[in-house]
Swiss-Prot record:
Task of the protein: Displays ATPase and GTPase activities.
Lineage: Bacteria, Bacillati, Bacillota, Bacilli, Lactobacillales
InterPro entries according to UniProt: P-loop_NTPase (IPR027417), RapZ-like (IPR005337), RapZ-like_N (IPR053930), RapZ_C (IPR053931)
Residues binding ATP: 13-20
Superkingdom, natural source: Bacteria
Name of this chain's protein: Nucleotide-binding protein Lreu_0386
Organism annotation: Limosilactobacillus reuteri (strain DSM 20016) (Lactobacillus reuteri)
Family annotation (HAMAP family): RapZ_like
Keyword annotations from UniProtKB, A to Z: ATP-binding, GTP-binding, Nucleotide-binding
Similarity-based family: Belongs to the RapZ-like family.
Amino acid sequence: MVDKKLKVVIITGMSGAGKTVAVHSLEDLGYFVIDNMLPGLAERFVDVIEDSREFDKIAMVMDMRSRGFYDEVLPNFEKLKKRADLDVKLLFLDANDVTLISRYKETRRSHPLSPQGRILDGVELERKLSTDLKSQADIVIDTTNVTPRNLKLRLNKLFGHGEGNDFYVEVMSFGFKYGLPLDADIVMDVRFLPNPFYIPELKHLTGNDPAVQNYVMQSPLAKEFYQHLRSLLEIALPGYIKEGKSSLTIAIGCTGGQHRSVTIANKLSADLKEKGYKVNTYHRDIEKAK
């Protein structure tokens, strides 16, 4: 067996944000997955896996079900992160409070932190306790407006390519009317650009259609904005890589997430791919007007 780093993904996040989908997705990608791992046993488990030489990538779910979770998870994650023989990523799944409460009500489950009280109380306490953990995550995914199928596709893009060591960019379009994406590192508002929505022959098309792309990008304002955006990213992306960031989510927003944001996101994705970056394009709200 060729000596190489063992890939380790730690899956955590808000209760109800999609950890079960993440488990099944990584299993489908060939990861050996352990649910409800005690943080204090994680390094010992990793050593056993390395000694066995049976697996080259593993995932561990760590969440509040484990006693002492909030006190132990970050110190143990940092210990694993420092090891030269491991490629460790911390994945944090999130969603807004309304979505989490709705999911709990659909399943008729109580929240682990408020088994006898209001679901909202448990969600708010969990979010407060998770602040430091989320800030240390390598990858944060907001599942608020994401179907299980689309979450699986995003995880496949993140963990199914190459060796997983390269910097990875997700370019997302969205509509402000549906809420800001919680997982965005950079948010650009393009609502100031000419809006194809008011052109009858373009209204029912999207930024995936050449006619809409041409309409948006023929504007001098759009051309100038895009040049500045590219210049910004030419400085920012190498800086993020130098700081050790493994992935970056760039969110482009317009009113409904159909025309302008999709156009800019597509163009930016194509240009970043030409420069050699690994890019996934995700149009969060493009189906909502249908």
